[in-house]
Amino acid sequence: MLLNVLAVGDVCGEGGQDILARRLKELREAENIHFTVVNGENASVVGITPRQARGLYDAGADVITLGNHTWNRIQIADFLEKDRYILRPANYAGRVPGRGFGIYDGPQGLKIGVINLMGRLELNANLDSPFKQANQILRREDIQQCDVVLVDFHAEATSEKGAMAWYLDGRVQAVWGTHTHVPTADGQ
């Protein structure tokens, strides 16, 4: 089966939430989108609240990924523990609330793995290596049983995003980068 995936990032502020609420379901239907991953870490400009996460689900997001603004709205911590459809970067160092990857049911019984990782270049966060963390997750039996594995790599530098894409080539079905809120000027 051909799986049509839509990756949306980063949803910024009320304007981003509003356009998603008005257009995402229509787009999913028009383009026969089966699974949608939305980076929602800027839904409240910096960070996301549980109410905003629920709004993204209502708009049509299947999974929400986060990034360097994960902890800007402290009320999200409990939500991250309870809701398996919202992911924070898997490579945050130490014990932090939530999960960095998930396995979800797709159409026709497909198992879809989604991994959320964050780059370390020019991002001020306490992070383990995203490359080592990717390896650890991809060695897990439950992830290996997935039909499709998708990776949202939240990073500043296009060089780091490109390195991750090459590193995961042949091991996952898709890698995309989120975070930079403007188009790149380096031909990427």
Regions found by a protein language model. Give the residues of each.
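Acidic, metal/ion-coordinating pockets
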Residues: 1-188
